[in-house]
Amino acid sequence: MIQVTLIQIDNYGPWTVTPGPRAEPDLQTLQSRLYGDLEREFGAHGAIVFFNRFDNLIAISNGMDYDDHLLIQQSIRNRYPITISMGVGTADTAYEAQKIATKMIQNGGGAQSANRCEVLNIDSLADDDNSLVQIAHIDINDITNTLTDIETAFDTSIKVYEVLLALMDELAKIGGMCFFIGGDNYMAPTNGISKDQLREALKVVDKKTGVTLKAGIGVAKQAGRAADLADIGLEDIRAELVDDSVLLFNDLDEY
């Protein structure tokens, strides 16, 4: 089971314009700092946070319980002018788990509700016996020579985000999610998706976007370790140690 935590800034839209519109550089700084702090605090528990939309962040939080989440909420309250609410859900696939986590937050009130503050609603937690995280680290083949060094920076970004949208769409169809993590890199929680299914999804995106993708996959009890294994797999593909576009490393013998 994969455990997903949705993190949402409380009443953020109204706060940004109260008592008047706040300076945009200050808001961007707040969002980036908040993401960095959440990544560090969740990461201390072996989890990973994806910035998603910055005011709505998604964490793969296997191994974390109610108290772990509560302490992070309190830490943010003590250091920021805003508060955060969280919803937690588990499921066989990442897409289904985030649906449950979203419902948990929505049950506590709307995103712009002045009455919602530090909601922490947990549908279920993945225990050690059934905790499993599968993460794919995906990148574009030779982006330096095909895009970065020959196209403008903005045109390269258009292509990178075109690939992201195609990956999000294809992986969601089979129960996965996908997030941009910088450069030409994407990270995808892919519980329940086989190597063959992922390989086929990458081929579909290749055809749609005109790039060539490859992916390392990691399987472990927690997201941090799964991502590390995925990184190793991707590095082996880059080094041409294997003749495949997808390589999986697994910490769990029973998987």
From Swiss-Prot:
It catalyses: GTP + 3 H2O = 2-amino-5-formylamino-6-(5-phospho-D-ribosylamino)pyrimidin-4(3H)-one + 2 phosphate + 2 H(+). One of its GO terms (biological process) is biosynthetic process. One of its GO terms (molecular function) is GTP cyclohydrolase IIa activity. It comes from the Archaea. The keyword GTP-binding applies. InterPro entries: GTP_CycHdrlase_3, Nucleotide_cyclase, Rev_trsase/Diguanyl_cyclase. Its EC number is 3.5.4.29. Keywords: GTP-binding, Hydrolase, Nucleotide-binding. HAMAP family: GTP_cyclohydro_3. Belongs to the archaeal-type GTP cyclohydrolase family. Catalyzes the formation of 2-amino-5-formylamino-6-ribofuranosylamino-4(3H)-pyrimidinone ribonucleotide monophosphate and inorganic phosphate from GTP. Also has an independent pyrophosphate phosphohydrolase activity. This is GTP cyclohydrolase III. It comes from Methanosphaera stadtmanae (strain ATCC 43021 / DSM 3091 / JCM 11832 / MCB-3).
